[in-house]
Amino acid sequence: MAVELMTRNYISGVGADSFAVQEAAASGLKSIENFIGLMSRDSFNSDQPSSSSASASASAAADLESARNTTADAAVSKFKRVISLLDRTRTGHARFRRAPVHVISPVLLQEEPKTTPFQSPLPPPPQMIRKGSFSSSMKTIDFSSLSSVTTESDNQKKIHHHQRPSETAPFASQTQSLSTTVSSFSKSTKRKCNSENLLTGKCASASSSGRCHCSKKRKIKQRRIIRVPAISAKMSDVPPDDYSWRKYGQKPIKGSPHPRGYYKCSSVRGCPARKHVERAADDSSMLIVTYEGDHNHSLSAADLAGAAVADLILESS
């Protein structure tokens, strides 16, 4: 209600100002009409032949000039008044008051839920991606391991049944067999490389395709560092030890003129033992030998022959 009263007063004030602006503009336009009439009278008199004397015409021209200046000044002042009135109507700030908040009756609150339509929740989208991923993982399952595990679980059931004839024994055996099948299933679903060489422990497909799909578990390398005196100034002269070694590469060391040589055990084919030899930075007459991995010389002659045949097949392909 307070806002409506203030709005009416504001509108009435604006109406009075607009009426004054209209009056000032009308009087200014009237002054311009008078000025135009005086200008046209001057041109009309100049076109007609003069019958009076020159002095009378000079006085009439002076009177006309003064009247014309007066009319022009009056028109300018009236239009200035119009401009000032327009500027005055644009200044100022509107004031508003907040009306009291209307209290909503509880009857309307009770009737509102009846009018709103009931919206049923949308059904969840079908999980097609999970089914596809499960089917893709099922393709790589090794069923031989599952069959062996299920037979072992059946044997465990029989043993538990004979040992404990109570009612809780079958339930315990079932839970144990279920846990073993789940663990074996999770192990079998892991991604393995079928082309892994069991003798060497290396992936055979990596040499042909350049990519290996074996599990990327980081192996903890066991290192053993010793210092031995150098035999000569040549890096190829390495002090001998209990095993025979074959050099397969070298790498330069930053800040040292002597490179680091890399060797692998050649006593038995496929031995994972490695070592690298480098000059000591504090004493050039000493060598630092770092051993990595353990020696594995327990392979039989048949295993060595099989590994050699596998390597020949890979090299020929």
From Swiss-Prot:
UniProt protein name: Probable WRKY transcription factor 15
Coiled coil: none
Subcellular localization(s) per the UniProt record: Nucleus
DNA-binding stretch(es), residue numbering of this chain: 234-300
Keyword Transcription regulation: yes
Domain of life: Eukaryota
Record field: compositional bias (Low complexity): 173-186
InterPro entries linked: WRKY_dom, WRKY_dom_sf, WRKY_plant, Zn-cluster-dom
One annotated GO molecular function: transcription cis-regulatory region binding
PANTHER family assigned to the protein according to its UniProt record, in alphabetical order: WRKY TRANSCRIPTION FACTOR 21-RELATED
Described purpose of this protein according to its UniProt entry: Transcription factor. Interacts specifically with the W box (5'-(T)TGAC[CT]-3'), a frequently occurring elicitor-responsive cis-acting element.
Database matches in Pfam families: Plant_zn_clust (PF10533), WRKY (PF03106)
Keywords: DNA-binding, Nucleus, Transcription, Transcription regulation
Organism: Arabidopsis thaliana
Region (Disordered): 145-186
Main subcellular location of this protein, as a coarse class: nucleus
Gene: WRKY15
